Structure formats: C-alpha cells, structure tokens
C-alpha cells in the first residue's frame, strides 16, 4: 500500500515538473512575440509623428507590413511619383492620400490601429514583383489578421481617388471612421468674387441700356452651356474625383475612355461634351437652314453641314456608348 502511494506521488511530481518545463519555452516565445510587436508599433508611431504617410522600401514593407506579429492595419499606396514615370494620376492620388493621412494623424480619434504607408516603384520594385502588381496607383489594405482579401484592394477606376471615397472604403474594411479635413482653398471664393465684380461692372457700364439682360440668344447660349456640362458627367467628376486618364506603366498606352459603365475619366467628360456640342451645332444649322431668309445656296450648304455634323458626332457618341455598355446591339456608321 505504501509502495503504491509512493509511486503515485512520484508520478504526479514528474508530471507537474514536465508541465512547468514545457510551459517555460511557450511563455518565453509569447513574451518575445509581444516585444517584437511592441517594437514594430513604436517604430511606426515614431515615423507617423514625423510624417503621416510612411515611405517604405522592400525591407521595411516585408518587416512591418507582411511579417507577423501584427495587431494593426496598414493602408499602403503603391505608386510611381518620379518625374520620368510621367504618372499624372499618381501625383493627384498622392495629394488626396496625404490629405486623408493628415486628417487621421491630427484627429482626436487617432490610435495605433491603422497606419498609412506608400511604396514607390523606384524605391521598392521588388514589392511590386512580389505582389504581381503592374499598375499604379493602387491602394491595398493589409489587415491586422490574415492576408488581404479581394475587397481589401481599392477599386480606383470605379470610386475615384478622392480622400472622402478612400475614407469610406477604409471604414468598410477596418471599422475606423476618418473625418476628412481639407486645407482651406480660397480659389473658389476668389473666382466667384471676380465673376460678380465683372458682372457688376458690366451692369454699371450699361446701366443706361439694360436690353442685354433680355437678350434671348445670350440666355439660350448660357443655358446650353450648362446643359452640356451637366449631361457630360461633370457633376459625377466633382463628387467622385476620378483621374483625368489612365496610362499603362508598361506599354505607355493612355486610355481616355473607361471600359466600364460604372466609372469614367475626366477626359471622357470633355470628349462627350465635345460630341454633344457637335450634335447641337448640327441641329442649329439645320434649323437655320429651314427658317433663314438667306439665299438658297447658303441654306443648302448649312443643311449639308448640319446633317454631316449630326451624323458624324452622333455616330462617335454611339460608339463610345457601345464600348462602355458591352453587348449593346446598335451602332451607326462606326462600330
């Protein structure tokens, strides 16, 4: 009986000793992991205090963004800002990204849950190769846990690159709400004041004859310009802030027409406005040819010119529509 009791006590003692010995390495590893994480967060906070958008090369990206442990998200902009890259969109996107990062850095809700970083192609081309990335600018959210999913890549062509749009995307992916605070822009008020001054000056100079205020042609032209601007998508550009065009960094080919019906470029707005203006001018010439008191020869020329403008520009407009709405069955002169 005593031997059995002695054997049981020895067994329990050995088991407890083994548990203690095995637990020591795990505790040590956990402590080391916490120290590494603390060092990474402190380093990122130090850089963020100096510059809200942290510039990273390949080594920094792999150590601070890709390698565990990590309890923070990193919003990374992959870009090409060097002058010889001739990426106009990259410059515009960088300005919006800086505004967003500054808004977060100086917000009362600022924490170490999320950081902003950028990788320039000329400083971290190995990162572009590692991620199989062939276009810039590109925004990717690297979450605190796991790998980036499909939704963690920002749809630049659809949403545009305005700071407000990127902030909404970040809120969807990280639950961090950023209130965008833009630096004051006095260009708008100055232009409005200048316009009012010009109008006031004209009214003052023509105060003895105010018939120009009742000129139907002038009001019709102003209304037509407003309609052309609105129907071309100018308001969509103002809200979404899309790029002017897209240049392929490998081939150098520039796209002025977006291939999707859900987005557009600024250049596309100008093209559509020009085509609508051409159709309108053609219709005006046709109306003048039918109602004018000019000789028959000039009226025939106006009629032919009007028909030509309507046919040509409407055909171009329809071809753009077909390129954006794939499967649209109708065309006119041009496919």
From Swiss-Prot:
Membrane side Cytoplasmic: residue ranges: 206-209, 292-300
Function in brief: Accessory component of the STT3B-containing form of the N-oligosaccharyl transferase (OST) complex which catalyzes the transfer of a high mannose oligosaccharide from a lipid-linked oligosaccharide donor to an asparagine residue within an Asn-X-Ser/Thr consensus motif in nascent polypeptide chains. Involved in N-glycosylation of STT3B-dependent substrates. Specifically required for the glycosylation of a subset of acceptor sites that are near cysteine residues; in this function seems to act redundantly with TUSC3.
Protein name: Dolichyl-diphosphooligosaccharide--protein glycosyltransferase subunit MAGT1
Localization per Swiss-Prot or TrEMBL: Cell membrane; Endoplasmic reticulum; Endoplasmic reticulum membrane
Topological domains annotated Extracellular: 30-184, 231-270, 322-335
InterPro entries cross-referenced by the UniProt entry: OligosaccharylTrfase_OST3/OST6 (IPR021149), Thioredoxin-like_sf (IPR036249)
UniProt-listed CDD domains: TRX_family (cd02947)
Keyword Membrane attributed: yes
BP GO terms, sorted: protein N-linked glycosylation via asparagine
Alphabetical UniProt keywords: Cell membrane, Disulfide bond, Endoplasmic reticulum, Glycoprotein, Magnesium, Membrane, Signal, Transmembrane, Transmembrane helix, Transport
Lineage, opening ranks: Eukaryota, Metazoa, Chordata, Craniata, Vertebrata
One cellular component (GO) term of this entry: oligosaccharyltransferase complex
Disulphide bond pairs: 87-90
Glycosylated sites: 71
Recorded topology in the membrane: Multi-pass membrane protein
UniProt KW Glycoprotein keyword: yes
A Pfam match: OST3_OST6
Domain Thioredoxin: 47-175
Signal peptide: 1-29
Pathway membership, UniProt: Protein modification; protein glycosylation
Quaternary structure and interacting proteins, as annotated: Accessory component of the STT3B-containing form of the oligosaccharyltransferase (OST) complex. OST exists in two different complex forms which contain common core subunits RPN1, RPN2, OST48, OST4, DAD1 and TMEM258, either STT3A or STT3B as catalytic subunits, and form-specific accessory subunits. OST can form stable complexes with the Sec61 complex or with both the Sec61 and TRAP complexes. The association of TUSC3 or MAGT1 with the STT3B-containing complex seems to be mutually exclusvice.
PANTHER family: DOLICHYL-DIPHOSPHOOLIGOSACCHARIDE--PROTEIN GLYCOSYLTRANSFERASE-RELATED, MAGNESIUM TRANSPORTER PROTEIN 1
């Amino acid at each position: 009986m005593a031997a059995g009791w002695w054997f049981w006590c020895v067994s329990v003692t050995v088991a407890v000793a083994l548990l203690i010995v095995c637990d020591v390495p795990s505790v040590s590893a956990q402590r080391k992991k916490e120290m590494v994480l603390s060092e990474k967060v402190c380093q990122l906070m130090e850089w963020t205090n100096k510059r809200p958008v942290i510039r990273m090369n390949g080594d920094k990206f792999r150590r601070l963004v890709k390698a565990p442990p990590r309890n923070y998200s990193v919003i990374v902009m992959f870009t090409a800002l060097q002058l010889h890259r001739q990426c106009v969109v990259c410059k515009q996107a960088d300005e919006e990204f800086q505004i967003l990062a500054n808004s977060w850095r100086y917000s009362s809700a600022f924490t170490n849950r999320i950081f902003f970083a950028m990788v320039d192609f000329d400083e971290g081309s190995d990162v572009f190769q590692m991620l199989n990335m062939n276009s810039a600018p590109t925004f990717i959210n690297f979450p605190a846990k796991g790998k980036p999913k499909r939704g963690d890549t920002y749809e630049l062509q659809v949403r545009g690159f305005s700071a407000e749009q990127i902030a909404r995307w970040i809120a969807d992916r990280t639950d961090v709400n950023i209130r965008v605070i833009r630096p004051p822009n006095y260009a708008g008020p100055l232009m409005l004041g200048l316009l009012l001054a010009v109008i006031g000056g004209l009214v003052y100079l023509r105060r003895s004859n105010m018939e120009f205020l009742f000129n139907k042609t002038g009001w019709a032209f102003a209304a037509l310009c407003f309609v052309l601007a609105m129907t071309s998508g100018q308001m969509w550009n103002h809200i979404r802030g899309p790029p002017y065009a897209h240049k392929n960094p490998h081939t150098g080919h520039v796209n002025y027409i977006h291939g999707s019906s859900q987005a557009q470029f600024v250049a596309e707005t100008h093209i559509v406005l020009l085509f609508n203006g051409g159709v309108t001018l053609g219709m005006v010439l046709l109306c003048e040819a039918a109602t004018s008191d000019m000789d028959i020869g000039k009226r025939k020329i106006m009629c032919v010119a009007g028909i030509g403008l309507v046919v040509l520009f409407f055909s171009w407009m329809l071809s753009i529509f077909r390129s954006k709405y794939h499967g649209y069955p109708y065309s006119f002169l041009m496919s």
